Design a protein with these regions (language model features):
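Terminal alpha-helical segments
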Residues: 1-125
Length: 125
C-alpha cells in the first residue's frame, strides 16, 4: 500500500475507534457521523491505490462503484451501506436529526465492514 493510502486507512481506523467510544458514551449522532467518515476515508484509501481522487462525497462513492467495485476489488455489499448513509450523515450534521442506538450501531458496523474490506483488498500491495 502506498504511503498516502496507508495514511488514509489509518485515519479511517482512528475514526472507527472514536465512533465506538462515542457510541459507548451514548452520543449516537456524533458516533454515526464519525463512522460515516471512517468509511469515507477507507474509500479514499482504496481510490488512492488506483491513483484516483474525488472532489466530493457523491463523486467519491460513484468513482468507488465504477472503478473499485466494477473491477471486483470490493463488493457492492460493503460499499452501498456507506454510500446510502451519506444522507443520514448530512441530516445529523446539518439538520440536528436525532437517531437512536440501533441506527448509529448499524452505521458503525457498516463502516467497520468497509474498512476491513479495504484492508484485505489493498493491505498487501
Amino acid at each position: 500500500m502506498s504511503p498516502r493510502s496507508d495514511e488514509l486507512l489509518h485515519s479511517a481506523q482512528a475514526r472507527l475507534r472514536s465512533a465506538r467510544d462515542q457510541l459507548a458514551a451514548g452520543h449516537h449522532e456524533t458516533a454515526a457521523s464519525t463512522a460515516y467518515y471512517a468509511g469515507l476515508y477507507a474509500a479514499r484509501s482504496a481510490l488512492s491505490e488506483l491513483d484516483l481522487n474525488a472532489r466530493s462525497h457523491r463523486g467519491l462513492w460513484q468513482m468507488l462503484r465504477e472503478r473499485v467495485v466494477a473491477e471486483g476489488l470490493l463488493g457492492r455489499e460493503v460499499v452501498e451501506p456507506l454510500q446510502n448513509a451519506q444522507a443520514l450523515r448530512e441530516a445529523v450534521d446539518y439538520d440536528a436529526k436525532q437517531i437512536g442506538d440501533e441506527a448509529a450501531r448499524e452505521l458503525l458496523d457498516a463502516a467497520q465492514r468497509l474498512v476491513t474490506a479495504v484492508e484485505e483488498a489493498f493491505g498487501d500491495r
